[in-house]
């Protein structure tokens, strides 16, 4: 997966709490088992006015021209609650998002996001509100997420620190998912396998 060190990008806010995985990617779009192709269905019931997804909702932030190309999502508490579907971080990443900033995340979503190279950043509610207000007030405003130094920088230059388990931080910095982490020990695995007697293989 793509490594995450420091990312600066356009931020977009969905000022709602308890955004669940069925809102992130509705169940009717879960038939695929590969990670690509889900971005078009992200927030389907909010982004579109029709079931077919042909009529964009002009009032939804992700459809507004000023937020086109946004790579950082701001949201309220308990983001990613609901079912454990891994398609939720797949859809967010396939849409082009690199980081989600919210006061709290559902535990399973939080882990799934990290495992798929999507950085979930927990900040105090007041910090998230300041970021939302600055982004709303300044078209084209960019936010920086610095994983190396564990800080977020607002459009005005305000800095907010966040925490992340060191193992997760290192995996994201190096772009290692579960498979990549295993392959990093390929030499040791091969050496161990070479010592297994033939009759036990």
Swiss-Prot record:
GO terms for biological process: L-leucine biosynthetic process. GO terms for cellular component: 3-isopropylmalate dehydratase complex. Its EC number is 4.2.1.33. It catalyses: (2R,3S)-3-isopropylmalate = (2S)-2-isopropylmalate. Keywords: Amino-acid biosynthesis, Branched-chain amino acid biosynthesis, Leucine biosynthesis, Lyase. It comes from the Bacteria. CDD domains: IPMI_Swivel. GO terms for molecular function: 3-isopropylmalate dehydratase activity. Pathway: Amino-acid biosynthesis; L-leucine biosynthesis; L-leucine from 3-methyl-2-oxobutanoate: step 2/4. Heterodimer of LeuC and LeuD. Catalyzes the isomerization between 2-isopropylmalate and 3-isopropylmalate, via the formation of 2-isopropylmaleate. Belongs to the LeuD family. LeuD type 1 subfamily. This is 3-isopropylmalate dehydratase small subunit.
């Amino acid at each position: 997966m793509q490594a995450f060190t420091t990312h600066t990008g356009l931020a977009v806010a969905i000022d709602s709490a308890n955004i669940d995985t069925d809102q992130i990617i509705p169940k009717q779009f879960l038939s695929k088992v590969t990670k690509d192709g889900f971005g078009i269905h992200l927030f389907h019931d909010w982004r579109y006015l029709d079931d077919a997804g042909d009529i964009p909702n002009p009032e939804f932030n992700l459809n507004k021209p000023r937020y086109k190309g946004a790579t950082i999502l701001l949201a309220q508490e308990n983001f990613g609650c609901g079912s454990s579907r891994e398609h939720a971080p797949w859809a967010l990443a396939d849409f082009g998002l690199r980081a989600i900033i919210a006061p709290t995340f559902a535990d399973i979503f939080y882990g799934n996001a990290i495992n798929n190279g999507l950085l979930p950043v927990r900040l105090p509610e007041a910090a998230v509100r300041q970021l939302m207000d600055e982004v709303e007030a300044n078209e084209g405003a960019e936010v920086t997420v610095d994983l190396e130094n564990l800080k977020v920088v607002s459009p005005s230059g305000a800095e907010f620190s966040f925490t992340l388990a060191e193992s997760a931080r290192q995996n994201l910095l190096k772009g290692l998912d579960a498979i990549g982490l295993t392959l990093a020990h390929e030499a040791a695995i091969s050496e161990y396998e070479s010592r297994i007697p033939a009759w036990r293989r």
